[in-house]
């Protein structure tokens, strides 16, 4: 094949191209490796989980959960149940994360256990709809809350919201492209900010309770249903709530960038999930100390309405706090979304350019640019609550398949070293609830669930054409090589080199790009 650019193998890391040619700005003969750096400690690991979970969901989902629950009491039950199910899933992911210590999360585990097609379908749905939709929803929530004080009596103009959302997205794409350390510092800082914002809501809510303002929480009122509850509606309420908990598995996407992942991955999960469940439950309790169910359902910005009713002159604090919270959520989603694209390209399931990192910053710039572009497209179309239903259904489908893989791995490879091995009842209990949720979601919203399945299945022909079919015409190979060379020169990126042993912290040294000469013309 013409040219020297190496295509990633179907499994494992791509090998560096032989005899690379020096390019301007690099140091010929440098012996150091270009690789992803291990800069994520326990604190940053916790903030990645908390920062990704606590984004826009707690400010959007309460309305959807209450609408489908039919009562305050049942809505609160859904939030507690959501935290419990998330805890079960996170325990299973902790076992998978230390047994298969690869970045890529669900995608890496499904590919390892079920093979390339299953892994590609999960990757396809995640890259095409799950991540860009979640990022679009969080970005639009950010802009709506920032603009709320400017348009206090109406919904902010759609054009203004989209422009501000895009500006925020591009800013954070630049930050993540420039430095892993900058990205994690932003995550640490804004996670602390969002916890302070929710602590303010919870604190004001507790003050309301101590003053006796909890009429909606009294049992006689809390379980006064304004519609006949059904299992199908309860399943939809849980799907809405699950959007607020999405992100609990994101730390598994950056395992290779963690310091001592075998210890810090499970520790971060055990610290973060109970904390988030506590915060979510008491935030919703606080909402109901200030608003009736009807007021909450009619509110376009729940936290803003809460602030207007209880904070008076300081009500401006709430939209600012929510904006800071969602800003951190955008950063966290970008960070993990780009690592998923990076892992997929490294396995040969996405264009090889996405498996490359900048020679100095050691960041996956091509993957970040793809993430930004895909989110921008999704941002231009779609209703928020409909998008949440699509994403929640596909998310839960992928979670269940991954945890089913845990049981299959136990059976196939019983001798595999597992520093963490959860009780068998935990994955079984999760899968029982998972099956229940999906069945009743199909019954209640067949269109939404059907579209979700179709989105996943559209990846089948793409897999066979793009991945499985190896003997493509030479013109296709020349085109892809040419585009890869062009992308390398534009982004100044190189394949990361395999680590012979655990990499120490430190600056990423410059290295050589794989040959940037153009592919030779066929003879």
Swiss-Prot record:
| Coiled-coil annotated spans | none
Q: In which tissues is it expressed?
A: Expressed in brain, heart, kidney, liver, lung, pancreas, placenta, and skeletal muscle.
A GO MF label: L-amino acid transmembrane transporter activity
Q: Which Pfam families match?
A: AA_permease_2
Where composition is biased (Pro residues), the residues are 15-25
Outline the segment boundaries, as ranges, of region: Disordered. Answer: 1-28, 499-523
Q: Where in the cell is it found?
A: Cell membrane
Chain ranges passing through the membrane: 40-60, 72-92, 113-133, 268-288, 310-330, 362-382, 388-408, 424-444, 448-468
Ordered alphabetically, the record's keywords are:
Amino-acid transport, Cell membrane, Disulfide bond, Membrane, Transmembrane, Transmembrane helix, Transport
**UniProt catalytic activity:** L-alanine(in) + glycine(out) = L-alanine(out) + glycine(in); L-serine(out) + L-alanine(in) = L-serine(in) + L-alanine(out); L-threonine(out) + L-alanine(in) = L-threonine(in) + L-alanine(out); L-cysteine(out) + L-alanine(in) = L-cysteine(in) + L-alanine(out)
Q: Report one GO cellular component.
A: plasma membrane
> How does the protein associate with the membrane?
Multi-pass membrane protein
Q: What does this protein do?
A: Associates with SLC3A2/4F2hc to form a functional heterodimeric complex that translocates small neutral L- and D-amino acids across the plasma membrane. Preferentially mediates exchange transport, but can also operate via facilitated diffusion. Acts as a major transporter for glycine, L- and D-serine in the central nervous system. At the spinal cord and brainstem regulates glycine metabolism and glycinergic inhibitory neurotransmission by providing for glycine de novo synthesis from L-serine and glycine recycling from astrocytes to glycinergic motor neurons.
Which protein family is it in? Answer: Belongs to the amino acid-polyamine-organocation (APC) superfamily.
Could you identify this protein by its name? Asc-type amino acid transporter 1
What would be the name of the gene that encodes this protein? SLC7A10
